[in-house]
Structure formats: C-alpha cells, structure tokens
Amino acid sequence: MRRVVHLFLALSMLTLATNSRAQRTNVVRTTVRQIILTLETDTDTFKRSLDHALDRGPLDGTRAEDEINDYVKQFEHATDKLKDRAEDNRYAPNLAREVLIRGRSINTFMRKHQLGGDAGNDWARVRQDLTLLAAGYKVNWRW
C-alpha cells in the first residue's frame, strides 16, 4: 500500500511538473507571437518614415536608396516567414536568427547614413523589438 501511495505521489508530481512546463511554454509562445506582431507594426511605421526621409534627402534616386529598400524588403519577408511559423505554434529560432541578421543590415545602413528624425526613432523601436525577439528565442545577439 505504501508503494502505491509513493507511486501515486510521484506520478502526481510528474504530471504537475509537465503541466507547469507546458503552461510556461504557452506563455513564451504567446509572448513571442506578440513580439512578432509588434515588430510587424513597428516595421511598417519605420518603412513609411524611411521612405519619407529617403524621398526628401540626398539619397533619393541613388544606389544607396535601392540598397536600403532591398534590405527592408528582405527583412519584411523574413519576418513574414517567422510570423507564419509562430502562428502555427512552431518554434523557429533559425528564422528568428534570419530576421535578426536582416535587421543588422538595416542597422548598419542607418548608422552609416545617419538617418535621424522619424526614421531614426522608428528604427530604434524596431531594434528594441528585435532585442526582445532574440531574448524570446534565446538567441545570443549583439548589434
């Protein structure tokens, strides 16, 4: 009888631990999905302010303008893939890493060309989102 009680207690503790782990996983997934949605919204805002800054600045019509537009397009595509994976509840650290790498290209451009104003502020928000994304996926990341 004592063995049965110990076995029951052990199974109960295992079940509780498993349920707790599952709940934590669901919280993490929900948080990561929210980060991705915020990232998309902030990226759209950044893209509009970047277009505005480029059209009214010395980079208008240059190869550099084409370059940053291509970086942003690739970044948005990678973010869309990550969002699709997150909506399917699939953990995708490699896609998160791709989004971060694409973001790094934009960051390098923004620093090199010193685009400030709304574009700079909006990019700073996107960078914060990316830092949260890296933490959510446990990706070691530095700018």
Regions found by a protein language model. Give the residues of each.
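Generic structural concept
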Residues: 33-36, 40-43, 65, 69-76, ...
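Heptad-repeat coiled-coil alpha-helices
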Residues: 45-48, 52-55, 59, 81, ...
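A charged, solvent-exposed segment within the mature domains of Sec-exported extracytoplasmic proteins
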Residues: 111-143
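Positively charged n-region of N-terminal signal peptides that target proteins for export
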Residues: 1-4
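Immediate post-signal-peptide N-terminus of mature secreted/exported proteins
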Residues: 21-69
